[in-house]
Amino acid sequence: MIKRIQIPDILQPVSHYCHVVEANNIIWISGLVGMNYNNSIPENTKDQFDIAMRDFDTCLKAAGGDFSSVTKVRVFLTNIDDRKIINPKRIEYFGEHKPASTLLEVSALVDPRMKVEIEAEAIKLKWAW
Protein backbone atom coordinates (compact mmCIF):
# COMPACT_ATOMS: atom_id res chain seq x y z
CA MET A 1 0.00 0.00 0.00
CA ILE A 2 1.19 3.51 -0.82
CA LYS A 3 0.56 6.24 1.74
CA ARG A 4 0.77 9.90 0.77
CA ILE A 5 1.23 12.50 3.49
CA GLN A 6 0.60 16.23 3.13
CA ILE A 7 2.02 18.21 6.05
CA PRO A 8 -0.23 21.19 6.88
CA ASP A 9 2.43 22.98 8.96
CA ILE A 10 5.02 23.45 6.21
CA LEU A 11 5.15 25.23 2.86
CA GLN A 12 2.51 23.71 0.60
CA PRO A 13 3.42 22.14 -2.76
CA VAL A 14 3.35 24.46 -5.75
CA SER A 15 2.69 21.64 -8.21
CA HIS A 16 1.20 18.15 -8.41
CA TYR A 17 3.05 16.26 -5.65
CA CYS A 18 2.89 15.57 -1.94
CA HIS A 19 5.47 16.12 0.79
CA VAL A 20 5.95 12.47 1.74
CA VAL A 21 5.24 9.08 0.19
CA GLU A 22 5.60 5.90 2.24
CA ALA A 23 5.42 2.33 0.93
CA ASN A 24 6.81 -0.94 2.27
CA ASN A 25 8.38 0.94 5.20
CA ILE A 26 10.36 3.20 2.87
CA ILE A 27 9.87 6.97 3.16
CA TRP A 28 10.47 9.38 0.27
CA ILE A 29 10.53 13.10 1.04
CA SER A 30 10.01 15.63 -1.74
CA GLY A 31 12.35 18.56 -2.18
CA LEU A 32 12.18 21.05 0.68
CA VAL A 33 13.40 24.63 0.41
CA GLY A 34 14.22 27.42 2.82
CA MET A 35 10.98 29.36 2.59
CA ASN A 36 9.08 30.28 5.76
CA TYR A 37 5.35 29.70 6.26
CA ASN A 38 4.68 33.36 5.41
CA ASN A 39 6.51 32.89 2.08
CA SER A 40 9.53 34.91 3.23
CA ILE A 41 12.95 33.63 2.21
CA PRO A 42 16.05 34.47 4.26
CA GLU A 43 18.90 35.93 2.25
CA ASN A 44 21.57 33.56 3.54
CA THR A 45 22.13 29.87 2.86
CA LYS A 46 22.51 28.89 6.52
CA ASP A 47 19.04 30.17 7.46
CA GLN A 48 17.48 28.65 4.35
CA PHE A 49 19.10 25.31 5.18
CA ASP A 50 17.78 25.47 8.76
CA ILE A 51 14.23 26.08 7.52
CA ALA A 52 14.46 23.20 5.05
CA MET A 53 15.83 20.90 7.76
CA ARG A 54 13.10 21.95 10.21
CA ASP A 55 10.51 20.96 7.60
CA PHE A 56 12.48 17.80 6.81
CA ASP A 57 12.30 16.81 10.48
CA THR A 58 8.53 17.44 10.47
CA CYS A 59 8.11 15.23 7.39
CA LEU A 60 10.25 12.45 8.86
CA LYS A 61 8.27 12.40 12.10
CA ALA A 62 4.93 12.39 10.24
CA ALA A 63 6.04 9.25 8.40
CA GLY A 64 7.47 7.44 11.42
CA GLY A 65 11.13 8.30 11.00
CA ASP A 66 13.81 10.62 12.32
CA PHE A 67 17.28 11.72 11.23
CA SER A 68 18.75 8.34 12.22
CA SER A 69 16.42 6.57 9.78
CA VAL A 70 17.57 8.56 6.72
CA THR A 71 19.26 6.34 4.15
CA LYS A 72 19.96 8.86 1.37
CA VAL A 73 19.94 12.65 1.16
CA ARG A 74 20.37 14.94 -1.84
CA VAL A 75 21.24 18.59 -1.41
CA PHE A 76 20.92 21.03 -4.29
CA LEU A 77 22.86 24.31 -4.02
CA THR A 78 22.88 27.26 -6.39
CA ASN A 79 26.48 27.94 -5.29
CA ILE A 80 28.66 24.90 -4.62
CA ASP A 81 30.89 26.99 -2.33
CA ASP A 82 27.97 27.06 0.14
CA ARG A 83 28.83 23.46 1.05
CA LYS A 84 31.26 25.02 3.54
CA ILE A 85 28.22 26.54 5.25
CA ILE A 86 25.93 23.51 5.21
CA ASN A 87 28.41 20.73 6.03
CA PRO A 88 28.77 21.75 9.71
CA LYS A 89 24.99 22.21 9.89
CA ARG A 90 24.46 18.66 8.58
CA ILE A 91 26.52 17.33 11.48
CA GLU A 92 24.28 19.26 13.88
CA TYR A 93 21.20 17.52 12.48
CA PHE A 94 22.51 14.03 11.72
CA GLY A 95 25.08 13.68 14.50
CA GLU A 96 27.07 10.47 14.07
CA HIS A 97 24.57 9.08 11.52
CA LYS A 98 25.98 9.28 8.00
CA PRO A 99 23.41 8.60 5.27
CA ALA A 100 24.42 8.14 1.66
CA SER A 101 24.60 11.60 0.16
CA THR A 102 24.74 13.53 -3.09
CA LEU A 103 25.54 17.23 -3.35
CA LEU A 104 24.72 19.02 -6.59
CA GLU A 105 25.15 22.54 -7.86
CA VAL A 106 22.18 23.68 -9.94
CA SER A 107 21.71 26.81 -12.01
CA ALA A 108 18.47 27.76 -10.25
CA LEU A 109 15.69 26.57 -7.95
CA VAL A 110 11.97 27.32 -8.26
CA ASP A 111 12.40 30.87 -6.88
CA PRO A 112 15.51 32.87 -7.79
CA ARG A 113 16.00 33.85 -4.11
CA MET A 114 16.35 30.19 -3.07
CA LYS A 115 19.84 28.83 -2.49
CA VAL A 116 19.25 25.28 -1.19
CA GLU A 117 16.83 22.36 -1.60
CA ILE A 118 16.88 18.99 0.18
CA GLU A 119 15.22 15.67 -0.68
CA ALA A 120 15.71 12.30 0.94
CA GLU A 121 14.78 8.68 1.51
CA ALA A 122 14.45 7.00 4.89
CA ILE A 123 13.03 3.88 6.50
CA LYS A 124 10.37 3.69 9.17
CA LEU A 125 11.95 3.54 12.61
CA LYS A 126 10.42 0.21 13.52
CA TRP A 127 12.54 -1.24 10.70
CA ALA A 128 15.69 0.78 11.39
CA TRP A 129 18.74 -1.11 12.58
Each language-model region and where it sits:
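N-terminal presequence-like segments and the immediate start of the first folded domain
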Residues: 1-71, 77-129
